[in-house]
Regions:
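Acidic/His metal-coordination segments adjacent to aromatic residues that form catalytic metal sites
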Residues: 25-39, 93-103, 174-181
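Long, well-ordered core segments of solenoidal/helical folds
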Residues: 2-19, 23-29, 71-89, 134-152
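Surface-exposed helix-capping loop/turn segments at secondary-structure junctions
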Residues: 12-16, 59-66, 86-92, 124-129, ...
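Oxyanion-binding "anion nests"
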Residues: 50-99, 103
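Short, contiguous, pocket-lining structural segments
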Residues: 34-48, 66-73, 106
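CBM-like carbohydrate-recognition segments
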Residues: 103-106, 110, 115, 121-182
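Well-ordered alpha-helical scaffold segments within catalytic/enzyme domains
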Residues: 1, 48-66, 112-127, 182
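Extracellular glycan-targeting catalytic surfaces
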Residues: 3-7, 47, 54, 132, ...
Length: 182
């Protein structure tokens, strides 16, 4: 039920994306007073949701009553995620729909989650095989854009947002400025 609730409350049909958060009471400083949604699409929040949704099906029997709804959500997620894949690099932006906006940056953890989601969903047959090309572009982009070999031969993943959230201490207001500052 939580998966369907979040899809119903955070999905934006104009962009095909899911907002970072939703406040039922619509009282949080970041919440839209009409919808309760946060003001932006943070890629890592979408990535965590996508990974969770695709993983849940591993524990859900094929005849489970709500399985078709989950499959619809997975296909909706795939469509939205691929729509915002950066064409040159194959990875995704920190603020998903704000490509090339000054200050926005290509972000590794969200891109990794999106690649995981797309690969698993294709491999399990949850989404059409045509999404495999986007998953491969994303994987190759991860390697080219974010993996750095250190002088000692170890590897580092770069361009990872340290932390972001909504509400609480400080000005965690979900604004574009907040996300690019993290």
């Amino acid at each position: 039920n939580q998966i369907k609730l979040i899809a119903r409350k955070t999905y934006d049909p104009k962009t095909g994306l899911f907002y970072h958060g939703w406040d039922e009471s619509k009282t949080q400083n970041w919440a839209n007073k009409e919808t309760g949604c946060s003001p932006n699409f943070w890629s890592r929040s979408i990535g965590w949701y996508a990974a969770a949704v695709v993983d849940v099906l591993d524990y859900m029997p094929a005849q489970f009553e709500g399985r078709d709804s989950i499959m619809t959500i997975i296909n909706t997620l795939a469509e939205g995620i691929v729509k915002y894949q950066e064409p040159e690099t194959g990875v995704w932006w920190q603020v998903t729909d704000q490509n090339n906006r000054k200050g926005n940056y290509l972000e590794s953890s969200a891109s990794s989650l999106f690649v995981y989601f797309l690969c698993k969903a294709v491999n399990k047959g949850y989404i059409p095989v045509e999404y495999k090309a986007a998953a491969e572009r994303g994987f190759n982009g991860l390697i080219k854009q974010f993996i750095k070999e250190e002088p000692d031969g170890s590897y580092t993943i770069t361009n990872c947002c340290a932390v972001a959230g909504l509400g609480g201490k400080g000005n965690r207001d979900g604004s574009f400025a907040y996300y690019i500052g993290e």
